[in-house]
Structure formats: C-alpha cells, structure tokens
Amino acid sequence: LPASSAASDVYKRQLLHFLTSSVNKKDMDAQLLNLWRCAYALTKRGARYDYPEKYWLGGTPLNETFVSLHQIIPQFKKRNNVQKVQCVVLTDGEASGIPVVTEFKNHDGEVRRGTSNVGYNSFLRNRKTGHVYNLSGHYEYWKFAETMLRDLKESFPDVNFIGIRITDRREFGSFLRMFHATEDEIKKARKNASFSIKNSGYDSYFAILDSSLAVD
C-alpha cells in the first residue's frame, strides 16, 4: 500500500459478540441455535446449513482480543454499573506475535506500507498509562501474550483475569512444558484431564483436555 494509506486499511480485526445475557430466553435460544449451526457447518461436510462467509475460521486472534479488552472492560463496567470484574478468556490455541504497520522502500524507491511481526528489539508502550515493556526476551511466541496481560492487569488492577486453554491430548504435554511443568505433573494432569498453571500472565490459568468435555 502507498505510505499515504491509513494504517487501519493495512491491518484490521473484528471481535465478534455472539451471545449476551441481556436478551430474553427466546432470543438466547435463537442465538445459541444459530451459533450451533455455524459451528456444525464449519466442521461437517455436506451440512444442510451454511455459514456467513465472513465467519470463516482463521488463526487465533488472542493478542488482538487483549487489545480490545482495553475498550470492552470499561464499557462493560459502565453499562452494568460494577466495580469489580472477573474476565474469563477461553481459547483453544496460542497466538503468534501481533503484526504492526511498517514502512519500506520498493525497488523504485517509493515508500510503501505493509505489516510485519513485532521484532525482538522492540518495546510496547501504553500511551494512556505510560508503561513501557521490553520485548527483547520474547523468543518464545507465547511470551507476547503474557506482556499483553501484564499491561491489562496494570491498567485494570480491580479486574481478575482467568484463562482457560482447551487442548487436545496430542498437544497437552507440550503445552504444559511451555510453563515448565515436570513430567510427573504432566502425567498427573493427563489423569485429571486438567492442570492449574501458576507461572503465567493470568491471575489463574487452567489447561483442560478437550476429551473431558461433554461434546455432542
């Protein structure tokens, strides 16, 4: 894109709001049914239902969700007139580094704009709080999410952040090793189909095997 293009034209994300407790039972049932139909159409070939084209699944927008929470949390507190909030993040995957807008010169010397991942020699600055975070140690891709959580916790000290990571049996062990779980702990966690992670960016973080869930 030309350098004159807006950064928002280069990189966009939309966080979708599927369900809400502010509706009556009839509308809630309709919301749940439509969500089930979308999920069924995405996972079953030859399904009678089709899904909206813009709902096609891509990567895990976890870091983008953390960015959105800086707006969602104040809006939620104001709308519901609450002071303390429990924020639960449910995900079935990790996120890679968040893309940023960069400028470069093409072979004609024209300045262009594109995207690239945040470099290891970069810093993250919260313009509102003034907090600055060094990203130099983020050679492990999941560490970026921990920095995003740290910024959220410093921005909203009255919010309790709880993470729930759904994982299949194949990746369960490797996921726990990311947080330095021992082999004995992993063996016990497989038996219990869950594990409480103590050294993450969340106030509480739980890994749950998908085989332990009631799946229809």
Where in the sequence are the language-model features?
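Charge-dense, low-complexity intrinsically disordered segments
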Residues: 1, 56, 139
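Single conserved hydrophobic/aromatic residue that forms the stacking wall/gate
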Residues: 1-7, 11
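Generic detector of low-complexity/intrinsically disordered segments
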Residues: 3, 17-21, 211
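Von Willebrand factor
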Residues: 9-82, 143
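VWA/integrin I-like adhesion module and closely mimicked acidic/polar interface patches used
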Residues: 68, 78, 94-185, 192, ...
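Structural motif
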Residues: 84-88
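Active-site flanking residues adjacent to catalytic metal/cofactor-binding acidic residues
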Residues: 91
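C-terminal helix of von Willebrand factor
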Residues: 184-216
